From Swiss-Prot:
E.C. numbers: 3.4.24.-
Residues the record lists as binding Ca(2+): 405, 408, 410, 412, 415, 418
UniProt subunit comment: Monomer.
Alphabetized UniProt keyword annotations: Apoptosis, Calcium, Disulfide bond, Glycoprotein, Hemorrhagic toxin, Hemostasis impairing toxin, Hydrolase, Metal-binding, Metalloprotease, Platelet aggregation inhibiting toxin, Protease, Secreted, Signal, Toxin, Zinc, Zymogen
PANTHER family attached to this UniProt entry: ADAM A DISINTEGRIN AND METALLOPROTEASE DOMAIN (PTHR11905), DISINTEGRIN AND METALLOPROTEINASE DOMAIN-CONTAINING PROTEIN 28 (PTHR11905:SF32)
Protein name: Zinc metalloproteinase-disintegrin-like halysase
Amino acid sequence: MIQVLLVTICLAVFPYQGSSIILESGNVNDYEVVYPRKVPALPKGAVQPKYEDAMQYEFKVNGEPVVLHLEKNKGLFSEDYSETHYSPDGREITTNPPVEDHCYYHGRIQNDADSTASISACNGLKGHFTLQGETYLIEPLKLPDSEAHAVFKYENVEKEDEAPKMCGVTQNWESYEPIKKASQSNLTPEQQRYLNAKKYVKLVMVADYIMYLKYDRNLTTVRTRMYDIVNVINVIYQRMNIHVALVGLEIWSNKDKFILRSAADVTLKLFATWRETDLLKRKSHDNAQLLTGINFNGPTAGLGYLGGICNPMYSAGIVQDHNKIHHLVAIAMAHEMGHNLGIDHDKDTCTCGAKSCVMAGTLSCEASYLFSDCSRKEHQAFLIKDMPQCILKKPLKTDVVSPPVCGNYFVEVGEDCDCGSPATCRDSCCDAATCKLRQGAQCAEGLCCDQCRFKGAGTECRAATDECDMADLCTGRSAECTDRFQRNGQPCQNNNGYCYNGKCPIMTDQCIALFGPNAAVSEDACFQFNLEGNHYGYCRKEQNTKIACEPQNVKCGRLYCIDSSPANKNPCNIYYSPGDEDKGMVLPGTKCADGKACSNGQCVDVNRAS
């Protein structure tokens, strides 16, 4: 295992406090000058690692000493991370640059539980940290032969444009009210397991041609800007139990892939279409964000599709590079990703313990890295209703770019367990110093692990949840509780359906999930709309073209429901969302006739359904 090297660096405050200076972040009115010094100094001739796995910095802020703890942002880049740019003649150039020894860190201030930090140590220290609710920035002073840095509050940066920037999302495209009103106790075991699971967003960032020109046609400068931004986004989403990993970066260095418009909604649609028809075919990812140098109409700084995550067309957002300070642009991008993850704008009653929250409709001068109570509830409601699967895909152990580090709570190649540092570990089965099982221990975690030993073969580790499920049993040879379920095709729900992959999908339940408790399945005549081959009715898509159902397959296309609420007189309701046109289709495995179930838009023999 790699031994984590802790380096203490003192930042001695220079006995001068500046009144005004022009920095990368802009014109700063009030700042402190500090000089990083390593303590203790390395012995003469010792080899200095380029970027340590963990570091500490001591310095003073407003005359008070603070200690900044930093850890390298492991998993910031995926193993298959790639970068694409274009030659002057339009030739695509894709590389897989080595990013193992990167220089991007997360951290916190000692004795401040609510503090955060996002720092680049590539050329000096650049980034932000929060201290007692205030946001501070640090960046190197560009002085010859000097290690001087400036530390200053964001509020001391002169604002170039006093007009507030806003997100362009102006309305709800979906309603999660039926879910919001449900209590946690009403969740199915499947929904509860989904909520508890850690989520991963595999992100591709794209910089347009205007960005390339804005940063002097310098690929390295644009790349560094994007790295700084994603490092902040990663910090923001940690508190939501979501890990954001950069899997790809694309820079349009010869021309834009489409004509960008100042109308943000038009540009978003064009970008989303390009992503689906081009980018997804050559780079697997969950979400794409465009960073553009164009000025959108009015105060709009960005736009994203609400609830579009995992959708080939709608898992996308666009953000204007509207501020020199990268972490403000990062907050805007995190905001648009929040929309993709099902979160709408905060209302006046929403709180996060700060002056502003990530999902505020207007980008505040008070930078915030916190999601509000409303955002958390909306995100949970979205997850319960849609259960998007792409964000459950955990990176393989070999996908972690950096060598394994014992003590980071992530079980990597060569580790049996990882319970944190020796000071924080509370796991009696795991040796925190080596991340190996203690002598005599067979396991450290898992539903079939009890007091460091495998539970006996045949021990029930998870009860059956319904008639299509089976009680899961331990094998006596593993800590894992393997999921088992009844064979596909077994009748269920009083012969109204057939078991399919452990569930009993029937149309009535699907209508209730979409329209509420008063919903029921429409008359057969409504399903004839599936013969038309448009968004009102179809059975499948081929190259984004809706294919009409054959007459025998009409019960395997769009689901038609009747809502018996007094205000609803339509006997043929469909659920349509511009963020996901396929939502509201009859689910695979649903009974479509006696002895038959839906499979790929066809009504087939129940034993052939897959």
